[in-house]
Curated annotation (Swiss-Prot):
Identification of the protein by name: 3-isopropylmalate dehydrogenase
Positions annotated to bind Mg(2+): D226, D251, D255
Keywords noted in UniProt: Amino-acid biosynthesis, Branched-chain amino acid biosynthesis, Cytoplasm, Leucine biosynthesis, Magnesium, Manganese, Metal-binding, NAD, Oxidoreductase
Name of the top EC class for this enzyme: oxidoreductase
Molecular functions (GO terms): 3-isopropylmalate dehydrogenase activity; magnesium ion binding; NAD binding
GO biological process: L-leucine biosynthetic process
Broad class of where this protein is predominantly found: cytoplasm
InterPro entries: IsoCit/isopropylmalate_DH_CS, IsoPropMal-DH-like_dom, Isopropylmalate_DH
Family: Belongs to the isocitrate and isopropylmalate dehydrogenases family.
Gene that encodes it: LEU2
Length: 365
């Protein structure tokens, strides 16, 4: 029996981040219990407020170096009122690690882990049932990283949006490979503002060319971002598939999409530095929710982090079967009504984690 060893750097961060990472590790260890040939080597490091308290900086050098040498990074959450908005802030650690690891693509799925949760959506259940898309957001270009002029008292300020062909090419390839991981391949939706912005016209032209030349079996449809925002509320299933867009549009549309499933405690995310064509992309995985400093102990929903770990298994660790088993285990547990308070249940964080770990072992035995 050949041993598969995967090195995972854990960055629990602050407040509930510690709890949710513990539950995700519990799930990963449950895989090794029934499949001893799969071994996870965990290495804990500090980030965010916890790192500031211990070292004075939000991301210690040793944490960054460990992340660079790992197969993947699993992060909890950072921040909290304790650290305020001073010169050194917890969130700076997150921004730095994303930049240093060159995480250029952010993936945020929008779906229902169980149909039992449809009534939690602020939209009508018959409108949202069947919603299943992933927003692929370009993470290191665009207006957030463009030239900036601050108001110096003159009453003028500006931000500039720019994209290069290589930047658009690589995010398009990311979307294409994610599409191809499904049989049949998923449709691709590209969101832009090509009727106004020059950068969007370059974006649209480049997306079209890459799909046509490199992925002729795939389909891509273009949608103006303002129209897409309306579709997302009126009929979100129309965007099912892979949704690709630039940094600012992706920031906004993924936050809009995040309210559809009814709780941030359900939503995973991945930030990748390379293509998942061999299911071994390097990535950082984290829940979409924050550190929730006011939440009592053992009340946080761990599912977003557990589903982030499932994404990690499939995209970075080449353990697709195991990742699918984790997602199925989450569905089974929710179908049984085992859930935390944000979903209307009365189970604790650890009870939900224990139940999912049990189902994972049954599925993989």
């Amino acid at each position: 029996m050949s041993i598969i060893e995967k090195k995972i750097v854990l960055l629990p961060g602050d407040h509930v981040g510690v709890e949710v990472v513990e539950e995700a590790v519990k799930i990963l260890k449950s895989i090794s219990e029934v499949k001893p040939e799969i071994q996870f080597k965990f290495e804990n490091h500090l980030i965010g407020g916890a790192a500031i308290d211990a070292t004075g900086v939000p991301l210690p050098d040793e944490a960054l170096e460990a992340a660079k040498k790992s197969d993947a990074v699993l992060l909890g959450a950072v921040g909290g009122p304790k650290w305020g908005t001073g010169e050194v802030r917890p969130e700076q650690g997150l921004l730095k690690i994303r930049k240093e690891l060159n995480l250029y693509a952010n993936l945020r799925p929008c779906n229902f882990a169980s149909d039992k949760l449809l009534d939690l959506s602020p939209l009508k259940s018959d409108i949202v049932k069947g919603t299943d898309f992933t927003v692929v957001r370009e993470l290191v270009g665009g207006i957030y990283f463009g030239d900036r002029v601050e108001d110096d008292g003159s009453g003028f300020a500006s931000d500039s949006e720019s994209y290069s062909v290589p930047e658009v090419e690589r995010i398009t390839r990311m979307a294409a490979f994610l599409s191809l991981q499904n049989d049949p391949p998923l449709p691709i939706w590209s969101l832009d503002k090509a009727n106004v912005l020059a950068s969007s016209r370059l974006w649209r032209k480049t997306v079209d060319r890459v799909i046509k030349e490199e992925f002729p079996k795939l389909t891509v449809q273009h949608q103006l971002i303002d129209s897409a925002a309306m579709i997302l509320v009126k009929s979100p299933t129309k965007l099912n598939g892979i949704v690709i867009t630039n940094n600012m549009f992706g920031d906004i549309i993924s936050d809009e999409a995040s309210v559809i499933p009814g709780s941030l405690g359900l939503l995973p995310s991945a930030s990748l530095a390379s293509l998942p064509d061999t299911n071994q992309a390097f990535g950082l995985y984290e829940p979409c929710h924050g550190s929730a400093p006011d939440l009592p102990k053992n009340k946080v929903n761990p599912i977003a982090t557990i589903l982030s770990a499932a994404m990690m298994l499939k995209l970075s660790l080449n353990l697709v079967k195991e990742g699918n088993a984790v997602e199925e285990a989450v569905r089974k547990v929710l179908d049984q009504g085992i859930m935390t308070g944000d979903l209307g249940g009365n189970n604790s964080t650890t009870e939900v984690g224990d139940a999912i770990a049990k189902e994972v072992k049954l599925l993989l035995a």
